[in-house]
Amino acid sequence: MKLSLVAAMLLLLSAARAEEEDKKEDVGTVVGIDLGTTYSCVGVFKNGRVEIIANDQGNRITPPYVAFTPEGERLIGDAAKNQLTSNPENTVFDAKRLIGRTWNDPSVQQDIKFLPFKVVEKKTKPYIQVDIGGGQTKTFAPEEISAMVLTKMKETAEAYLGKKVTHAVVTVPAYFNDAQRQATKDAGTIAGLNVMRIINEPTAAAIAYGLDKREGEKNILVFDLGGGTFDVSLLTIDNGVFEVVATNGDTHLGGEDFDQRVMEHFIKLYKKKTGKDVRKDNRAVQKLRREVEKAKRALSSQHQARIEIESFYEGEDFSETLTRAKFEELNMDLFRSTMKPVQKVLEDSDLKKSDIDEIVLVGGSTRIPKIQQLVKEFFNGKEPSRGINPDEAVAYGAAVQAGVLSGDQDTGDLALLDVCPLTLGIETVGGVMTKLIPRNTVVPTKKSQIFSTASDNQPTVTIKVYEGERPLTKDNHLLGTFDLTGIPPAPRGVPQIEVTFEIDVNGILRVTAEDKGTGNKNKITITNDQNRLTPEEIERMVNDAEKFAEEDKKLKERIDTRNELESYAYSLKNQIGDKEKLGGKLSSEDKETMEKAVEEKIEWLESHQDADIEDFKAKKKELEEIVQPIISKLYGSAGPPPTGEEDTAEKDEL
């Protein structure tokens, strides 16, 4: 099957090359851009090899920061980042964490607490509000900020090439949803670039690793942990054909989250020592952000780092030590969470750990020794490959793909087969999710299926398109809805309605429905304005199907334990207040002791609804230890004492 697929792909490729030959003059030199969260990078395929291009400061990677000075000047890149601490309210970064997301997205709400600039709601999306100089306030969409960064990368390439650049290949996290991909393409358009292809970051990194590897089929696992996003992709590489078998990840996990944990630790420590809350001072927080990031980098090669900040807050200096052990302790849950997607891609691709030929680490955060150790331990001591630069690999792969699209013969026969990260389908009778394209299907792809009407003489069918892994649509995410009308009267089950799903190379979905009897057609393109998924929902869905049973069990256990404590406390309260029961038998001293203990637990419950199972059990045990000796003393040996739970046995509360 794979051979025929490869043959078909190579035929497609040669046809595409012939087509590209005609267009070659139009596109000029196509550049490859890695539009990262914390660094961006641009490369070009020239004279048979990839050149990663240095910016005007001589750096091969550029921070995607945009700043507006009080004088009305706009700075992009290193110059913008360098003045962050003196102008935090008007220095914008992390646009990639906002792009293509809705305002209500929990991660947006979480992020804006820590961003020094103002983020406001506009058209249900997050927009950035800054003072652009001269007392003028302006609001930008995240796409506009990303466009400014893309413009900087474009100009960097133009300065090196000595000519205009109009076409580009731009990378996105493999786990970016449709809205985020579309928004990234829009950013390119705003920057005056024709984004010929959106490719997935781990796939681009695999090209960088495997371009010159021609020794037969290999299974490659790409572990891509950057500043803001995390992807794992499993590919097979075979003589220039790169086939993604499975992908997984988290579009909101990276180096910035590790920095945030350390910052929170020091902010608390500073408050404990001085009683002062530095959160009120934007500049102080940004100074701390800068120094924490430096310390984190230092800890990749040494065991401790000093953090010294002069005139940190209210004229006082800041001086603390961060050890590697403390850094790891603060982030251990995040580090360990990176192993789940690795396990998932192995399961999805039906491969064992021993089947992986190479592990490729990409992204600056893979320099963290603990991350390297966890990956190595997961693969039973196998050493990851160290052959590629983790900062430049993605731009390198994008530049190779750009070379292919510009018709450069030196790229050799390169074919990319990527996948869609989630199952796509439509709702059928009873709210059932009927799957048309399973997750990890190679794209581009097209799939059709015949459906029919559910009742006699039904003139209209409503097509509801969903994304997700659960068997019922109510648990999945609605992408869009459209109607196919004008179906001629007929008994149920007779009309033939063909629904076609088509995903293009950029991962954008188009759905068509056709009444085969009349030739009536209707279609919908799922794009940015369809209110696509938040990454949290994507992450949830992919893992939900398998995790749900386990999660539900844990949740039920927690609720049951909470209810046990609540029922026990209230049952005791009622008995103490009832003269016919305990109330009439207790001494006033014992009664007061029990009342106090019960009230204490009821109050605790009201403010700790979300506590852990262990906490609920511990509180119940505390209450029992106070109550049972009193009741035992009261009842003596006349049978078992009441536990306070007789009234509630076998009754679930509503």
Curated annotation (Swiss-Prot):
3'-nitrotyrosine sites (modified residues): 160
Enzyme nomenclature, EC number: 3.6.4.10
Organism of derivation: Pongo abelii (Sumatran orangutan)
Gene from which this protein is expressed: HSPA5
Protein residues bound to ATP: 36-39, 96, 227-229, 293-300, 364-367
Spans annotated as Substrate-binding (SBD): 420-500
Name the record gives this protein: Endoplasmic reticulum chaperone BiP
Assembly behavior: Monomer and homooligomer; homooligomerization via the interdomain linker inactivates the chaperone activity and acts as a storage of HSPA5/BiP molecules. Interacts with DNAJC1 (via J domain). Component of an EIF2 complex at least composed of CELF1/CUGBP1, CALR, CALR3, EIF2S1, EIF2S2, HSP90B1 and HSPA5. Part of a large chaperone multiprotein complex comprising DNAJB11, HSP90B1, HSPA5, HYOU, PDIA2, PDIA4, PDIA6, PPIB, SDF2L1, UGGT1 and very small amounts of ERP29, but not, or at very low levels, CALR nor CANX. Interacts with TMEM132A and TRIM21.
Entry's free-text remark on domains: The interdomain linker regulates the chaperone activity by mediating the formation of homooligomers. Homooligomers are formed by engagement of the interdomain linker of one HSPA5/BiP molecule as a typical substrate of an adjacent HSPA5/BiP molecule. HSPA5/BiP oligomerization inactivates participating HSPA5/BiP protomers. HSPA5/BiP oligomers probably act as reservoirs to store HSPA5/BiP molecules when they are not needed by the cell. When the levels of unfolded proteins rise, cells can rapidly break up these oligomers to make active monomers.
Post-translational modification: In unstressed cells, AMPylation at Thr-518 by FICD inactivates the chaperome activity: AMPylated form is locked in a relatively inert state and only weakly stimulated by J domain-containing proteins. In response to endoplasmic reticulum stress, de-AMPylation by the same protein, FICD, restores the chaperone activity.
One Pfam family named in its UniProt record: HSP70
Motif stretch (Prevents secretion from ER): 651-654
Classification via Gene3D superfamilies: 1.20.1270.10, 3.30.420.40, Actin, Chain A, domain 4, Substrate Binding Domain Of DNAk, Chain A, domain 1
Residues covered by region (Disordered): 633-654
Residue span of region Interdomain linker: 409-419
GO-annotated biological processes: maintenance of protein localization in endoplasmic reticulum; negative regulation of IRE1-mediated unfolded protein response; negative regulation of protein-containing complex assembly; positive regulation of cell migration; post-translational protein targeting to membrane, translocation
Region Required for interaction with ELAPOR1, residue ranges: 1-80
